[in-house]
Amino acid sequence: VSIDLFDSLPAPYGLIRYGVAPDHPRIKGIVNSLHEMLDSGKIRFFGNVLFGKDLTLEDIKRHYHAVIFATGAIKDAKLNIPGVDLDGSYGAADFVSWYDGHPDVPRTWPLTAEKVAVLGNGNVALDVARVLAKQADDMLSTDIPENVYQGLKASPVTDVHVFGRRGPADIKFTPIELRELGEVEDVEIVLYPE
């Protein structure tokens, strides 16, 4: 069996590379296992290939017996709440892509507010809050891109509040994520039952 892997990005590993917080080296360590698979010779990687432009379904069908579309989930859910489109309101997917150095997002991020509200009940919401709440220097031991480090260092953010859109029974974050957020210097976790 041989596998050809096409990606619109120049480097492989998708959301593991561009969707995991830089201070989570254990999860990012999966890249090493994937790298071994790519080096095995059974999988070939072709980067910078745009499906529909550089490669069509007809092209693929002519050369392959099976096709699997594995596109990831790098889009934000559309929130139907007032103010979601105001200046200063951003989706987590773009922010995560920025702090992970995704090549398709701007190198600078408008971190101009002192107080930030993060809406969400999942791990990504807590990752975003943790990255914003940490001192930039605490991220130096990670693989954080230099431009992101500089952006966080210059950031005026002093208060980060996480708001869940549903009740406590609907939380999606893991206890590990909550504990990691609570271990950040000067972070106080307050949970409201309603």
Predicted features, each with a name:
Residues I3-S8, P12, I16, I27-I30, ...:
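Dinucleotide-binding/catalytic capping subdomain of oxidoreductase cores
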Residues D4, R44-F46, Y90:
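General small-molecule cofactor/ligand-binding pocket signal
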Residues P10-A66:
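N-terminal Rossmann-like dinucleotide/flavin-binding domain of flavoprotein oxidoreductases
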Residues A21-I27, F69-P82:
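Ferredoxin-type iron-sulfur electron-transfer modules and their immediate structural context
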Residues A21-P25, L86-D87, R179-L181:
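Short, hinge-like loop/turn segments at secondary-structure boundaries
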Residues D39-F45, L86-D87, S155-T158:
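A short helix-to-beta-strand connector/capping loop
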Residues R62-G72, A117-L119:
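Short hydrophobic core segments
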Residues D76-P156:
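Glycine-rich dinucleotide-binding loop and its adjacent helix/turn
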